[in-house]
UniProtKB/Swiss-Prot annotation:
Cofactor names: Zn(2+)
Assembly notes: Homotrimer.
Protein name: Probable phosphatase YcdX
Gene3D superfamilies in alphabetical order: Metal-dependent hydrolases
GO biological process, one term: bacterial-type flagellum-dependent swarming motility
Taxonomy of the source species: Bacteria, Pseudomonadati, Pseudomonadota, Gammaproteobacteria, Enterobacterales
């Protein structure tokens, strides 16, 4: 459906079950050209140590024609927008996703959740907000979308939210997609795979986008070139190996 997947977890997050090699093989089989490994930030109970993220610098950029982005799904820690990604971790990572997770930031009222999310968006440290339609964390959707558009941060539509977790996300995610459309922002699609078998599956995301007539030219996953141009506009150095994608 789309050749880029921006959200997945490996065995380094111990509630996930596939390796980097598993994802590469599945990407090659499915025609995925570029993906990002985004294991949970170290403040989560079963997350990898921060050295795991720093040492991603040893990964090859391209394997069997598949591009690999070094990423993290960091945790929003407080209303100041702090995340559990810092220091040398930033030097090794291409893609910073951040979102709410109950073990790190418990659900609050709409005003508090919105304050924390907007502070994270405005921090300049994050490229994508993960699953902002989670019904456990109500937010002021229009305010979030406007802040994201202003700061060039994408809001995610997460396929797993409609299948395995965060049940009841459909209405919120339609509202998120519509608000991003109206604000002229970016949407990022993530399979949120915890096994390689679901890599690149955006079936439920597509239903949400179609329901609000979301413009294709504001979806980051449409091509590797679009996603890389977005990241480079946010300060990522061009990766020569990705030129052939």
């Amino acid at each position: 459906m789309y050749p880029v997947d921006l959200h997945m977890h490996t065995v380094a997050s111990t509630h996930a079950y596939s390796t980097l090699s598993d994802y590469i093989a599945e990407a090659k089989r499915k025609g995925i050209k570029l993906f990002a490994i985004t294991d949970h930030g170290p403040d989560m109970e079963d997350a990898p140590h921060h050295w795991h993220f720093i040492n991603m610098r040893i990964w090859p950029r391209l394997v069997d024609g598949v591009g690999i982005l070094r990423g993290i799904e960091a945790n929003i820690k407080n209303i100041n927008g702090e995340i559990d990604c810092s220091g040398k971790m930033f030097d090794s990572l291409d893609l910073i996703i951040a979102g709410f997770h109950e073990p790190v930031f418990a659900p609050h009222d709409k005003e508090t959740n919105t304050q924390a999310m907007i502070a994270t968006i405005a921090s300049g440290k994050v490229h994508i907000i993960s699953h902002p339609g989670n019904p456990k964390y109500p937010v002021e959707v229009n305010a979030i979308a406007q802040a994201a558009a202003k700061h060039h941060v994408a809001l995610e539509i997460n396929n797993s939210s409609f299948l395995h977790s965060r049940k009841g996300s459909e209405d919120n995610c339609r509202a998120v997609a519509a608000a991003v459309r109206d604000a002229g922002g970016w949407v990022a699609l993530g399979s949120d795979s915890h096994t390689a078998f679901t890599l690149g599956d955006f079936t439920e995301c597509r239903k949400i986008l179609d329901a609000v007539n979301f413009p294709e030219d504001r979806i980051l996953n449409v091509s590797p070139q679009r996603l890389l141009a977005f990241l480079e506009s946010r300060g990522m150095a061009p990766v020569p190996e990705f030129a052939e994608l």
